[in-house]
Amino acid sequence: CCGPTACVAGCKPCC
């Protein structure tokens, strides 16, 4: 879910 970009829609809160 968390990667080089911000949290994307459809992902659980992880940032």
From Swiss-Prot:
Location(s), subcellular: Secreted
Expression sites by tissue: Expressed by the venom duct.
PTM-bearing positions, type Cysteine amide: 15
One MF term in the entry's GO annotations: toxin activity
Domain notes: The cysteine framework is III (CC-C-C-CC).
Cell division in keyword set: no
UniProt KW keywords: Amidation, Disulfide bond, Hydroxylation, Secreted, Toxin
Similarity-based family: Belongs to the conotoxin M superfamily.
A single cellular component GO annotation: extracellular region
Disulfides per UniProt: 1-15, 2-11, 7-14
Keyword Secreted set for record: yes
This protein's name: Conotoxin SI.6
Organism whose genome encodes this protein: Conus textile (Cloth-of-gold cone)
Modification 4-hydroxyproline, positions: 4, 13
